[in-house]
UniProtKB/Swiss-Prot annotation:
InterPro entries: ATP-cone_dom (IPR005144), RdRp_reductase_class-2 (IPR050862), RNR_lg_C (IPR000788), RNR_lsu_N (IPR013509), RNR_NrdJ/NrdZ (IPR013344), RNR_R1-su_N (IPR008926). 5'-deoxyadenosylcobalamine (coenzyme B12). Induction: A member of the dormancy regulon. Induced in response to reduced oxygen tension (hypoxia) and low levels of nitric oxide (NO). The lineage of its organism: Bacteria, Bacillati, Actinomycetota, Actinomycetes, Mycobacteriales. This is Vitamin B12-dependent ribonucleoside-diphosphate reductase. It comes from Mycobacterium tuberculosis (strain CDC 1551 / Oshkosh). It catalyses: a 2'-deoxyribonucleoside 5'-diphosphate + [thioredoxin]-disulfide + H2O = a ribonucleoside 5'-diphosphate + [thioredoxin]-dithiol.
Amino acid sequence: MGVSWPAKVRRRDGTLVPFDIARIEAAVTRAAREVACDDPDMPGTVAKAVADALGRGIAPVEDIQDCVEARLGEAGLDDVARVYIIYRQRRAELRTAKALLGVRDELKLSLAAVTVLRERYLLHDEQGRPAESTGELMDRSARCVAAAEDQYEPGSSRRWAERFATLLRNLEFLPNSPTLMNSGTDLGLLAGCFVLPIEDSLQSIFATLGQAAELQRAGGGTGYAFSHLRPAGDRVASTGGTASGPVSFLRLYDSAAGVVSMGGRRRGACMAVLDVSHPDICDFVTAKAESPSELPHFNLSVGVTDAFLRAVERNGLHRLVNPRTGKIVARMPAAELFDAICKAAHAGGDPGLVFLDTINRANPVPGRGRIEATNPCGEVPLLPYESCNLGSINLARMLADGRVDWDRLEEVAGVAVRFLDDVIDVSRYPFPELGEAARATRKIGLGVMGLAELLAALGIPYDSEEAVRLATRLMRRIQQAAHTASRRLAEERGAFPAFTDSRFARSGPRRNAQVTSVAPTGTISLIAGTTAGIEPMFAIAFTRAIVGRHLLEVNPCFDRLARDRGFYRDELIAEIAQRGGVRGYPRLPAEVRAAFPTAAEIAPQWHLRMQAAVQRHVEAAVSKTVNLPATATVDDVRAIYVAAWKAKVKGITVYRYGSREGQVLSSAAPKPLLAQADTEFSGGCAGRSCEF
């Protein structure tokens, strides 16, 4: 450092940080690249001139930026100065917008992320104003979760709170939304989702409905198997009347979820599963196909078996069984029912399929029962009253010097497993059955987000063999690290109570019956500023609805690449926004077009291949949408569903573009056409309920 340079920089919030001339040089370099100024010595020369002009002491950040503008002007670099000034103006506008929202954002999140955090995550004072900053939100969650550490090593919670906070503040790992929302609050419910049982009695149906309302009020999602309810028209001995059937109660549950969500912090999200052998399966399959607005809070999935799908393949008959009596009440061609499922999914995305036999072959505690349902997005098959405590590693933050930082990935995975295990201990459970089930198996779900961004940063097309191989390797390493961490926790704290009844009883003890699961990540990937789960990018440039306006947004990875390589232009971005993607766009280099495919530009087979590759190293399940073009046929849906079964994934969802009104990503903007996204959309399914 020069003897006459500043020692410190005063940020806008008043904090002091060391002066770093490399940051000035990097900013000038980015501006120079945008105007194709290829003098390699210029940025360093300008940065040194700025440092010399500032002198010793403490330099306010605004003074530094003013000095950069002045030195560029003096050097006759007017084009570079113009780009630098525009960048400053945009940053100033962003700070102003955040200030108008009343949010202090030391994490430098996107405006969309800050908007969502303000509405649903940050604590507020009595006047409704945010009472904490974005960083303080992360600190609150870290402290709350780390409190569990004192149960096992008194006095250790402060140390672990600091480690947890580092992960959260760096956006290297984020837990599911309720952990961020409810940590340190009176609600205290930190688990993301639950499966609740519904038995064949009015008492059970309404008792479960009441429990669901309590969970949804606290931001928890709920999954149900309606398979035990007697079919419509069946005899009710106590009244002499007839049953209304599971679909009628499904509508009741949906209405209740809508009412609860009005007073809650996010829209109610639910999953309904009905066994393919239920006599009312045809009504269930078409429950949402008849009206796009029907059952808005529910995802629907048919619980299919290997026997049913083999009957489809050989054009055999399928038996429908009354769950009350266990007797066969009808037989129908399996292919006819499968066609009805595929037609409904083609029409609106529902129902998906849940492969019950595949799920139960991997059930870690088969002695505790057969799994019949999943959480709302399908990534965690659960027994009754079990919960999913989810968190995701941000793969986009696992890069160093243009390569995957495998050591950091394993370190983050290990700390994340400990975090999620602590969540089980500190979470409050509204009903004793929930706490008992959570502690019995201590299931957690460590997953990922940012896969598509990582691939793009490495120049690897999502729809390529190289991408599938890398995704496989990433998930294998994460699962191995998670297993190691869970075994270490078992040595410190003991195995999960149901260990002796588990598939692992003959192997070494584990703290958790399940450690990995890949969630869609929904809002948390938006907060982290990366792509959702293992989904591809949904658009490269688009407009996002924020506080009543549609603001142009560019994928951050593409934005950085375009500026670094010198082809960023405002008119270029406007053209891309009209298209959504860049595949087939002649103005960009071929390798850039290949590395930035959008979900709609990727063939369905590649979507499924990626899901299957990741599933091989995930103990629970993988939430992934197979996107289909608007021109896709029912036969295309049929082919994907069969291929998914044979690929041994645990569930499958398809979404044909434009098949549902109100989808959260569309090109239905006024002329000129622009890809549009809702405030909270970060990728994945553009039509189903994916709040988590």
